[in-house]
Regions:
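Signal peptide cleavage region of secreted peptide precursors
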Residues: 29-36, 40
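Hydrophobic membrane-insertion alpha-helices, especially the h-region
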Residues: 13-28
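Soluble "head" domains of membrane/secretory-pathway proteins
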Residues: 2-8, 24, 28, 42, ...
């Protein structure tokens, strides 16, 4: 009888430890998210299931072109790409990103840009000053984010600059559907 009781206690302990580990991992390290909508096409598709790395920004800062998940509202998280960092002046002119006056390539958009006719624009011209807040440069602890599908994305052009403390984490790994399994550039 005692042996059977000890086995049950061992199983209960193991399950409690596993549950605690799962909660710690989910809350502090990694979380699943599902892409909702077309705002990150062609990079991410509606329904892509991804893993959010929450740990990356506990020890570091976002980098230009990171794909991040952030709290857009109390109940809704968005997935967008970091375009502008603290201290940057951002401008788009003729589908070219300028950071502090220097043109910067966006290789993840090249396929879409190549398909445009001469009189079409993929990213409408704007300057940082055109965004809510009328900033000359992005202030400390904020980033400017855009969706890769520039004509169909609710991003910093509408939401304003995103405080870094609202960023949940970085996402680069699709685990479902299986035909899209892998890392995203």
């Amino acid at each position: 009888m005692t042996k059977r009781r000890n086995e049950w206690l061992d199983w209960i302990k193991a399950l409690i430890v596993a549950a605690i580990l799962a909660i710690v991992i989910r809350v502090f390290l990694f979380a699943p998210i599902v892409v909702d909508g077309p705002s990150m096409l062609p990079t991410l598709e509606n329904g892509d299931h991804m893993i959010v790395n929450k740990f990356s920004y506990l020890v570091g800062e976002p980098s230009r072109f990171d794909i991040v998940v952030f709290h857009a509202t109390e109940t809704k998280d968005y997935i967008k790409r970091v375009i502008g960092l603290p201290g940057d002046h951002i401008e788009y002119k003729d589908d070219t990103l300028y950071v502090n006056g220097d043109p910067i390539e966006e290789p993840f958009l090249q396929e879409r840009l190549d398909r445009l006719s001469e009189n079409q624009s993929y990213t409408f011209d704007f300057r940082l000053q055109d965004i809510k807040g009328n900033y000359k440069t992005i202030p400390e602890n904020h980033v400017l984010v855009l969706g890769d599908n520039r004509n169909n994305s609710t991003d910093s052009r509408m939401l304003g600059l995103i405080p870094i403390d609202r960023i949940v984490g970085e996402t680069r790994f699709i685990y479902w559907p299986m035909e899209r399994f892998g890392f995203v550039d």
